[in-house]
Structures are given as C-alpha cells and as structure tokens.
Regions:
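Membrane-interface helix caps and helix-loop-helix hairpins in membrane proteins
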Residues: 67, 95-96, 118-131, 138
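Hydrophobic alpha-helical transmembrane segments of multi-pass membrane proteins
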Residues: 18, 40-58, 175-185
Length: 234
C-alpha cells in the first residue's frame, strides 16, 4: 500500500498516471497528423506507453522493498531513449533525405551512455563509468548542435521540423542534465536512494512527455499547413 507520506512512492504513482495520459493523448492526436508525422506520434506514444508500464512496476518495487528499482529503470531507458533518437531521425526524414549513418551514430552513443550508467550504478567503478556516460552524452550534444544532424536540420527548409528539432535539442541538453546530477548524488556509500529516484522520476516526467509534446506540436502545425496549402491549390 502506498504511504501518502512517501515522497518517492508518490512521484512514482503520479508519473505512472501521467505517462498513461500522455500515451492516450498522443495516440488520439495521431489522427490529426498527415504523412510521416503519424509515425512520429506513434513513436512518441510508444515512449510514454513503455515508460508507464515500467513505472507501475518500479512503484511496486519501491513500495515493497524500499530499494531503488535499478534494473527496471534501465530496461525502460534502454527501450525509450533509443526511441527518442528515432524521433530525431524521423523529424529530419519528414522533410529531407537523411543518411542511415546519422541514425546509427545517435543510437550507439545513446546505448553507450546508458550502459556506462548502468554498470556504474551496479557498483563497478561508479565514478569512471559515470564520466564515460557523460562523455557519450556530450558526443550526442555535439552531433545535434554542431554535427551532421544539425547541418541536415538547417538545410531541411521545413519550419515545423526545424522548430521541433531546436526544441528537442534543448530538452536533450538542459533536461537530460538532470540525470547526471541524480547519478552522482545516488552512487557511492553516501548516496541517497530517495534523492536519486525523485530526481530520475522528475526528469523522466519532464523529458519523456515534453519530447512527445514537441513532436505533437510540430506534427499538428505542419499537417494544418499542408491542409491549407492543398485547399488553396484546389
């Protein structure tokens, strides 16, 4: 039974419900999108749907054991974080030609970031593993701010795609900065499981749902523009 005074447990519950609501919203709103944007909204719904399932399990682990649901959390991230980079690829592919190499660079970097974090949180060289995870994240930031992904976005010529891309890159830079803070507060003998889980939970709440909202905004905006253009030329 969830104790109303258990801050960590309450955050697990709130975020479970929020992820379910977001999944329903993105699924329903998919009908308003056209073309490749439908796929983008489907992936956004997959991200929050997968997260909702894992958050219900993580809440149960926390309530029953009082311990951090480490494995469930990283399984969730290993599924949802690569999907978020699929979103980056789909945004670019919606308006221009994108190389498969860009997709794999982002995918491999995101998986490396997570694997280093998991190994560190399991207690094996937590500080070096944490630093390696941060370096993988920094590479991702380089790619989306100054690398191939950034250049492809600048040349796309699609206003909705460019707006979404610019918003998402700031989520990955500012929003994702919360995760290393939680990691370094939680590892080591003085680490706090409560602080780590509250920080991770709030970060997931902001980053997963905000990611999807950005996609939804771009999808509905671009779809409305295309519909208006079609009516004007009819």
């Amino acid at each position: 039974m969830l104790d109303p005074n258990d801050l960590v447990g309450v955050t697990f519950w709130i975020i479970s419900a929020a992820m379910v609501a977001a999944t329903y919203f993105f699924t329903v709103e998919r009908d308003r999108a056209v073309g490749k944007w439908k796929t983008s909204l489907t992936v956004a719904a997959m991200v929050t749907g997968i997260a909702a399932i894992h958050y219900f399990y993580m809440r149960g682990v926390w309530i029953e054991t009082g311990q951090s649901p480490l494995v469930f959390r990283y399984v969730d991230w290993l599924l949802t974080v690569p999907l978020q980079f699929v979103e980056f690829y789909l945004i670019l592919a919606a308006s221009t030609v994108v190389s498969a190499g860009l997709f794999w660079k982002l995918m491999i970097a995101s998986i490396a970031m997570l694997m280093f974090g998991f190994i560190g949180e399991m207690g094996y060289m937590p500080l070096p593993m944490g630093i390696l995870g941060v370096l993988a994240w920094v590479y991702i930031l380089y790619e989306i701010f100054a690398g191939e992904a950034s250049k492809v976005n600048a040349a796309s010529g699609n206003a909705a795609s460019q707006t979404a891309y610019n918003a998402l890159k700031w989520i990955v830079s500012v929003g994702w900065a919360i995760y290393p803070i939680g990691y370094f507060l939680g590892v080591g003998e003085s680490g706090s499981a409560e602080a780590l889980n509250v920080i991770y939970n709030l970060a997931d709440f902001v980053n997963k749902i905000a990611f999807g909202v950005v996609i939804w905004s771009a999808a509905t905006s671009d779809s409305a523009t295309q519909a208006s253009s079609s009516q004007a030329t009819a």
